[in-house]
Every structure is written in structure tokens, then in C-alpha cells.
């Protein structure tokens, strides 16, 4: 497992990519600001972007009967949103919102799929 000390990312997943894999995805990464309460994913909707959080926290929220919601997960700088994309899916299982305003690296799902397929060979 790699842990590159000289790369300009705080996200633990990006820091652990091999130098070759990181070089192949960097042209497709874009740093974006994510204000608090920004909706990153919506239940049963197509996942538009995968976010590698650099700081802050995203909340994963499940819809319950009778209009109630419950938090089922948190994503921080050690993870990413859109994990279903890595498994071949394209739709979100839950809503995901930014809880704390911070920055992230945005990535198109198609590039994420290609990276995962290459890594599994």
C-alpha cells in the first residue's frame, strides 16, 4: 500500500494510490468547494460525481417510512462518496449531504469505474 507524502491531497484514498494510478486520474480530478448542506447524492438518482473529501464530513441519510430520515453513515477525508460506482452501480442508495463546509476533489463516475476495473486485474 502506498502513502505518498509529497502529493498535494489530504484524502487518504488518493494518498494510497500507486504513483501510476494517481498520475492517470489527476487530469480528471477537480478541486471544488462544498458548502454545508450541499446535496452530493440523492436516493435512487444517478450518481453525477464521486467526491474524495479533503476535509469536512458528509452525512449519509436513509429515508424511513412516514417521511422520517436517519443518519446511517459518515464520510470524511479517509473516504469517498459514490462507493456504489466502484462496485459497478450508477444510482445512489441514500441521500448524502455535506455536514461541514470544506473542499473535495470531484471525479466523474466513468473515470472511477475505469480505475477500479484496472485495479482488479
Identify the function of each model-found stretch:
Residues 73-121:
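Cyclic-nucleotide recognition modules
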Residues 1-16, 22-24:
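Non-catalytic regulatory/interaction regions at protein termini and inter-domain linkers
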Residues 37, 47-66, 76-80, 96:
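Glycine- and acidic-residue-biased ligand/ion/polar-headgroup-sensing regions
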Amino acid at each position: 500500500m502506498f502513502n505518498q507524502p509529497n502529493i498535494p491531497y489530504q484524502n487518504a484514498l488518493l494518498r494510497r494510490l500507486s504513483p501510476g494510478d494517481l498520475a492517470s486520474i489527476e487530469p480528471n480530478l477537480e478541486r471544488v468547494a462544498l458548502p454545508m448542506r450541499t446535496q452530493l447524492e440523492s436516493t435512487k438518482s444517478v450518481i453525477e460525481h464521486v467526491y474524495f473529501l479533503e476535509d469536512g464530513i458528509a452525512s449519509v441519510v436513509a429515508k424511513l417510512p412516514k417521511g422520517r430520515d436517519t443518519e446511517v453513515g459518515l464520510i470524511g477525508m479517509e473516504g469517498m462518496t459514490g462507493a456504489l460506482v466502484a462496485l459497478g452501480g450508477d444510482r445512489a442508495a441514500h441521500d448524502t449531504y455535506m455536514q461541514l463546509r470544506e473542499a473535495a476533489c470531484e471525479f466523474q463516475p466513468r473515470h472511477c469505474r475505469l480505475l477500479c476495473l484496472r485495479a482488479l486485474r
